[in-house]
Amino acid sequence: VANRVDTLFALGDFETVRYALSGDKAEPDLELRLNEKSWGPTFVRFDLGLYMGTTGNTAFTLAGDVLRTWINDRGGELNGSLRLGRTTGLEASLYQPLDTTQRWFVQPGLNAQTSLEDIFIDGDAVARYDFAETWGYLDAGRVFGNHAELRAGIRSGWQWADRDIAFPDLPEISAEGYGGWTARYTYDSRDRELLWRDGLLVRANYFESEEGLGAQADYRRAEGMAIYALPVFDNFAYVRGAGGSSFGSDLPVYDLFVIGGPVSFPGLNIGELRGDSYWTAQFGYLQQVAEISSVFGQAIYAGGAFTAGQMNRRIDGFESGTIYSGAFIVSGRTPLGPL
């Protein structure tokens, strides 16, 4: 019993954990006397990212996240994030459960971001735009068990698309109204957040613009992604599928689907393909080549991935059909973070 009580206290959610035996001496009842913390821990996380392409396409990001937990007796959380680099952004939100079981919740928040992005025509970078956005949102949703979440909400704000390096006659967007209805579903059974060896991750998003919320462009947008990983001894294999559609509507340039880069489509430059609908499929296998710490699950992996996909109604007017790529991968979980 004492070991179980120690395990419960180690969760970090209680100031004190005591127990007592009561009732019939022959068959006593175990009473746990818990005193919940009136405060919660604060988590701070930093991340550093660097991408260098063979054609001079580079990207650098320094990011930090702050999570303040249990700000009230319902388990409310304050979250803030800051990103610096080619993409610079700031986001702040309040996640507030509405009941003691923490199934129903609301989440208001603010988002502001600016990013320098290259525009490609048939594989060649011909312009660079500075995309910027700022909007607020309000979501409400429900958590299902330990793995699934469904939410819906509204957004309202503005979008910009300014020329940074481009011909003077290329179009620009200045403070265009942005707003609409959103829905999002997430299922997550991964054994860990990064480089997981077992589990399924599913994400699906839907957005429909609404003039009453400030939108100037009339369009719909749906996108989904699923990744399943399967352990193979100390190694693992995974399959990933993703796709998106505008349902025949014309997406504004700031909300086009984008693929290209080491994550979405290895072999393409970051953001090389932009369009109104797409699909991708990927199979990968990673072999453990070095173990750093079995206690913390830290190891180095090497392997490869094969990717196929197609982007339709591309911004450059080209229709290339299905394209393929192969990639060699070196990755891992290290004491300094993911590699």
Residue spans for each PLM region:
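Short coil/turn segments at secondary-structure boundaries
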Residues: R151-G153, W196-L201
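Outer-membrane beta-barrel translocator/pore domains, especially the C-terminal barrels
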Residues: R190-G199, L251
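A generic structural micro-feature
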Residues: G56, D130, A175-G177, W196, ...
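Short beta-strands and strand-coil junctions in structured, solvent-facing domains, enriched
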Residues: E15-T16, W39, G53, T100-T101, ...
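C-terminal transmembrane beta-barrel domains of outer membrane proteins
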Residues: R33, A63, N79, S93, ...
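Gram-negative/organellar outer-membrane beta-barrel architecture
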Residues: N3-R190, F257-V263, G271-G275, W279, ...
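Short, contiguous, pocket-lining structural segments
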Residues: I173-G177, R192-W196, G214-D218, P231
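Generic macromolecular interface patches on structured domains
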Residues: R18, G76, W104, L150, ...
